[in-house]
């Protein structure tokens, strides 16, 4: 199961890859069909993490405040078996997968997306770019040549942007919330010291009060 620091980096990576774009959202598996239909065509307004929880806000316009009542939040917790897998054209630089071991979307091997090439993307697979990874990504398919592969396995959620696709499989949680619902989850989780608004002292005090080691 990815720990909180990985989810924070994943949140930043998804913001780099899809932030400000109107996304096509599907649920190939069908279990999240209603939620996907509500998000389809909306703009990803950013991405946040709190502990092991990922929060993605969607709205009808790119210039919206996250406090707007029309913003819908997608909450995802990978759990033990959840994973994101990625595929895209040469403009789309992302890791192969995050979470439980998975092959890349559709098992297509012609365009390696290892490690990532940006500040948030680098190291998502647990390390920096390997030799030749940048060259491999640079020689991936051109935007006009790339086509989204068929979903592989039980894909709960698919996000399709201008240059690439992200598939979510096997999450412990995948649900839509309003702002009050997000706030309720965050209160239950307690402080996250990795967040800019995280109360580090409160986190340390809570950690010291626990008998179970962290």
Regions found by a protein language model. Give the residues of each.
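Structured catalytic/nucleic-acid-binding cores of DNA maintenance enzymes
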Residues: 1-214
